Amino acid sequence: MSNSASIAALVLVSVTSLAVGAFGLRLSRTMSDFYVASRGVGPVLNASAISGEYLSAASFLGVAGLVLARGVDMLWLPVGWTAGYLLLLVFVAAPLRRSGAYTLPDFAQLRLESVVVRRISSLLVVAIGLLYLIPQFQGAGLTLRTLTGAPSWVGQLAVAAVVGLNVLPGGMRSVTLIQAFHYWLKLVALLTPLFFLLGAVGARSGNPQTGAVLVADWVEPLRGEHALYLTYSLVLATFFGTMGLPHVVVRFYTNRDGQAARRATMVVLVLLSAFYLLPVAYGVLGRYVASDLVAAGRADSVVLELPSRVFDGPLAEGLTALLAAGAFAAFLSTSTGLVVSVAGVLSQDLLGWGAGHRQGIRAFRLSTVVVVLVSLLLTVVSAGVPVAHAVELTFAVAASTFCPMLLLGIWWRGLTSVGAVAGMMVGGGLSMGAVLTTTFGIATGGWFGVVMIQPAAVSVPLSFATMVGASLATRSRRPEHVSRTMVRLHAPEDVHLNRGSFHPERRETGAARMGAGAAEQGSGGGELGSGPMHRPTGTAYGSKTATEGAAGRDGTDGAVRRSGTTARRS
């Protein structure tokens, strides 16, 4: 079978993505545009972008492969990945947007008033982002190898190049448009061939192929040793890990206000529910006509190989090309979101902002190059880890670190910096140990080995318990301005209250500060000090030094005057 159609589809997706990104470049002029799209993305567009970013290589290829190989137990994966947004909707979306932070480290310092917590959060963002980039590049290599027989590194390098070219010029503005486009492309790419495949397979007679996998084993849930623990651990990792993924959380900062964040999350639940029905169907079809892929160790490629197993000639080539385009879009959209979130943290916390917005943009672009290159190197090191399992471990790390910090930080005023650090270190240490054990193939037996395969059932409760216990033991370290911060997080934007200020010292020109004011006022956030140009540093939260330089700033909706640590809208 000729692969020219598939190669043409990959090229077309890459070129179209670059064209959409170039259009976004026309709208990107400030650091606010680069990092949070000036907090002006509408709910439907943002929901499409969130869904496009979230549906990664594991969703497009891995779910079908796992359903084919392991059976009905793997149905918990799409359920958990979708249900995680229900937690975001109820507990996190609106307060996180009202915080006015750029990134998770920004939120950590705002809530806990600790530079140490910020630094640890920054390291975790980088670690989680790089871990999640690995399966994206692995999937790209798998796709190109399946279609053309080319070495895996060719596909990995191609995705890295396109991602870099998309992110470097336009930042979050470009990425938002690209990811929204990719969601609908992925949906069409899976849905259209599925109609043809279901019609053809439904017309066949006889028994399904069994290959090396018995039908009875495939349909029996909770089979095997420690199956119940592994299932619970998988559910916990996917359910709680969603809110801890930095590239997911950063998208909520791009909404206009807390209400828009909630609306976007509701639309995301609908879009994800519609999408995740499709890879499960491919896994079931693969069990029917291509179960030999399991014995051959190619279960992850079942989506790409199904058309050629059912059809011949141009129809098979066309359907395979469409699926290849969707798979490539999955790698690109998730990778761009990850690169933006990790590069944003690197440019803020490690490279610095310099003397103005141009220096900040330059730092962001340099960080983008670093992130792409490092993730490529890590992909080579971890070549033997299955795509879907690499994603499961990433979710376990996120669920064991940022999820407890976010939930307790938003809803419990008793959380202290000591408790947050202790919890993230305990949960992160255990889950990262599982990652290293899996990556380097360190053989372990007994219950310890089971925990290393799926650590979330142990690491997540332990992280929560450690944060609560350490915070109760250090009540005297409770943040000084916690009451004001809680008002900031929970009071609706249309309620005009003194929400405090989040204005650390900055070295920027008056023009840049004026531009930030316009972006903040246009976002409709309603709170002062939440504009995207305000990055926390070592300056104490709410101190006079941190805010006196921000007095007398005019926005576009009216004048906003600041004096000391109080703010009033006139």
Protein language model regions, located:
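Membrane-embedded helix-loop-helix hairpins and adjacent transmembrane boundary segments
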Residues: M1-G510, A567-S570
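Long, low-complexity, intrinsically disordered cytosolic termini of multi-pass membrane proteins
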Residues: A491-S570
